[in-house]
Amino acid sequence: QTTTLDVLSGGRMVLGAALGRDESGRELSAFGEELDDRTRAAMLDEALGLIEELWSGERVDHRGPHYRAHDVTFTPRPVQQPRIPVWIGGRWPRRAPIRRAARWDGYFPIDLADPEQLSDCAAQIRSLRGTLDGFDLIVETAPDADPAPWIAAGATWWLSSFVIDRAT
């Protein structure tokens, strides 16, 4: 589906990935999904590596601790090369998602309080990657927030969110 979307969009697909949480007891456990964070992290890392292999358009044989693929070829190949960008989401200030994101193309830190925290994110990722060139930092704020401080802190993408008050 990712390669199809990349082709149909003319190369504008971005894959977002994160561990997820079972806060309400309905997001993971209701479907029998793994609940241990470390195991889910290992599964995510393996899955992203496998997806990257599959995007190559070459024949893939993979036998990992969590996933198997035997003689699989994905076509069409993505328009974007060397691959579709991958953005990693994670709760600030947890370090594991930052380390994971530094290996990919972007980071969407959840629960940032202010631009200074985004600046801290940027510094950590720069220290891991050596540069922020070609790397996206995504922020989510209220629609009436001023983007200038976030841009100065390193934001490359801006998402506006609306809170729906269901009590009224």
Question: Which residues are covered by each model-predicted region?
Answer:
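Active-site-adjacent structural elements that line small-molecule/cofactor binding pockets in enzymes
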Residues: Q1-T168
